[in-house]
């Protein structure tokens, strides 16, 4: 067995927005004293940035979920090892991604133990919950269906959950909807899900859509940023738990000056955040 010949060591896995992936031993990034200069991490093309970053073991699985609703699986050691400053290898040379297919979420795991679930959110407001163990199946080289994505819709996020977590969905209209995932019954892989958030309205004449989904944990905040660079952080406690399928509560009032909502994520105090504009400014 080839795996018996591969050392079980901690790796840093990175995937950039333009689709370059690599693994690197965690030891490469040696711990420094406070005030250190850091080490050069990666040479990126202008405008590119690291979108997914995980620390995991060479023997872990990596699950790659795409906007088309497919999932691909690799062992960490199957990902090309790069140098500290290399961009890595184009993911299309590792996974058979189709034109227009993008990785939206990466979930590393050692096993597919019971009692864990995956929550899926689509741009059209659907939410789906599936037992994690359903993905412990031989995955063909060209991937398998993780969620059935309807015409005109796409997958925007996947999160690992306990089965009883609060889910927060955020729409382009600046609203956030919070509900407990127990309101969503577990479904099989080849299903579309149920309405998690109502996005039937329009924003500046274009259809509203879900931009982000995350697990709302205690002592966290929701951070949102608009297209013109305005940011706002509010306590997760400001968003009451309601039933699924609502339009949500206003998280930020959008104006022509602020622009539309560009993104949202759950953060903790003292975390550093990095913003990259469409023209590559950081």
Where do the model's predicted regions map?
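Short, structured "edge-of-domain" segments at secondary-structure transitions
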Residues: 1-282
């Amino acid at each position: 067995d080839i795996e018996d010949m591969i050392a079980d060591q901690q790796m840093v896995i990175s995937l950039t927005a333009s689709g370059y992936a690599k693994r690197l031993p965690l030891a490469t990034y040696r711990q420094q004293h406070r005030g250190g200069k850091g080490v050069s991490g990666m040479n990126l093309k202008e405008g590119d940035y690291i979108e997914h970053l995980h620390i995991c073991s060479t023997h872990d699985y990596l699950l790659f979920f795409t906007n088309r609703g497919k999932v691909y699986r690799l062992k960490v050691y199957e990902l090309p090892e790069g140098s500290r400053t290399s961009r890595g290898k184009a993911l299309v040379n590792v996974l058979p991604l189709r034109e227009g297919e993008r990785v939206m979420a990466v979930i590393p795991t050692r096993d597919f133990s019971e009692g864990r679930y995956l929550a899926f959110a689509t741009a059209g407001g659907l939410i789906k919950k599936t037992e994690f163990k359903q993905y412990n199946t031989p995955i063909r080289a060209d991937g398998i269906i993780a969620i059935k994505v309807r015409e005109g819709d796409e997958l925007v996020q996947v999160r690992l959950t306990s089965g009883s977590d609060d889910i927060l969905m955020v729409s382009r209209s600046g609203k956030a909807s919070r509900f407990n995932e127990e309101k969503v019954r577990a479904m099989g892989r080849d299903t579309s899900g149920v309405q998690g958030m109502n996005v039937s309205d329009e924003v500046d004449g274009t259809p509203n859509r879900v931009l982000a989904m995350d697990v709302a944990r205690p002592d966290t905040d929701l951070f949102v940023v608009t297209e013109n660079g305005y940011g706002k952080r509010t306590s997760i406690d400001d968003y009451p738990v309601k039933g699924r399928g609502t339009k949500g509560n206003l998280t930020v009032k959008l104006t022509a000056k602020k622009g539309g909502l560009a993104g949202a994520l759950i953060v903790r105090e003292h975390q550093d955040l990095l913003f990259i504009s469409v023209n590559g400014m950081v």
